[in-house]
């Protein structure tokens, strides 16, 4: 019996040892599994967190895309340009008169009336503004002069003469920057307000709130900023390359463009720095008058278009 008992004990011990070994091997195998120790509850939590993070990421991306596209459309920069067809007929612009009107902006007047609206951009004074003013006075024509800071600083007496002779002075910004690159209202306001302040110091009166974008560069947000500041924006429907001091057009070249492309309701842009303009303006006004045109002011244009 004892012998049997010993053998039985040995057998049981051997079986138990084998069983323990198998359990250990099983534990080792289980511990090596990649998902070892992760319960169903933990899996559920991770899955929920993943879905939440994915949803938030998708929402953020969609919002960023939407804002990006909106900003791109809103901040799109333009250079004002014109397309001419038949001589004597109004051109087409980058934007239509109706599209510009919602920003209190204009590029042409009433195309059924033989009226010209004469404007000058004044970047600096080089001796040509005086003969221009003399010609305007001779023909009793009132024009609008868009001035920058430099012109106000260096030629205050010329500005006073403009006002005394019934002309309008508008805002061409202080530093003649590419305003389409400005997205801040504070920066936009400073460029226009510095002109306002200096003009009032010189003349004792507020500047007329007419704005012309420097270089013809603009964006829709710029036009809205100008409107929010109480300005009316004026582009043009007739101009020619008259601003290069070392490459001035001849009298014949100037007349070809300015007589051939004149049209009813034209807002004409000339530069007061042009030697050619200073020399030909008297004769040019005479020729336009002989063609049956009269001259109006921008405030008349704006009031008719309102």
What are these regions (language model features)?
Residues 9, 13-17, 21-119, 125-132, ...:
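N-terminal pre-catalytic segment of deacetylase/amide-hydrolase enzymes
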Residues 81-183, 191-200, 207-208, 303:
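Active-site beta->alpha N-cap acidic-glycine motif
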Residues 116-119, 143-147, 168-171, 209-213, ...:
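Structural recognition of the beta-strand scaffold that forms the well-ordered cores
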Residues 123, 148-150, 174, 214-216, ...:
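Active-site beta-loop-alpha junctions enriched in small/polar residues
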Residues 128, 177-203, 217-264, 279, ...:
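Alpha-helical scaffold elements lining the catalytic groove of polysaccharide deacetylases
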């Amino acid at each position: 019996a004892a012998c049997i008992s010993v053998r039985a004990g040995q057998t049981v011990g051997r079986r138990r040892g084998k069983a323990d070994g198998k359990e250990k091997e099983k534990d080792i195998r289980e511990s090596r599994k990649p998902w070892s120790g992760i319960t169903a509850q933990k899996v559920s939590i991770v899955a929920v967190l993943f879905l939440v993070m994915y949803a938030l990421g998708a929402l953020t991306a969609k919002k960023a895309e939407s804002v990006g596209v909106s900003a791109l459309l809103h901040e799109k920069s333009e250079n004002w340009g014109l397309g001419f067809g038949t001589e004597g007929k109004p051109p087409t612009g980058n934007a239509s008169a109706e599209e510009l009107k919602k920003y209190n902006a204009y590029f042409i007047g009433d195309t059924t009336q033989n009226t010209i609206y004469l404007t000058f951009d004044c970047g600096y004074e080089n001796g040509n503004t005086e003969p221009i003013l003399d010609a305007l006075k001779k023909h009793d024509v009132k024009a609008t002069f868009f001035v920058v800071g430099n012109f106000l600083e260096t030629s205050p007496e010329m500005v006073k003469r403009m006002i005394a002779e019934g002309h309008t002075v508008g805002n061409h910004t202080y530093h003649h920057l590419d305003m389409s690159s400005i997205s801040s209202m504070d920066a936009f306001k400073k460029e226009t307000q510095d002109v306002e302040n200096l003009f009032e110091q010189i003349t004792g009166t507020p500047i007329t709130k007419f704005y012309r974008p420097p270089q013809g560069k603009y964006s829709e947000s710029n036009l809205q900023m100008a409107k929010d500041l109480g300005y009316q924006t004026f582009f043009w429907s007739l101009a020619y390359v008259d601003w290069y001091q070392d490459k001035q057009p001849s009298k014949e070249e100037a007349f070809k463009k300015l007589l051939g492309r004149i049209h009813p309701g034209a807002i004409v842009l000339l530069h007061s720095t042009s030697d050619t303009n200073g020399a030909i303006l008297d004769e040019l006004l005479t020729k336009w008058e002989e063609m049956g045109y009269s001259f109006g002011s921008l405030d008349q244009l704006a009031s008719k278009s309102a």
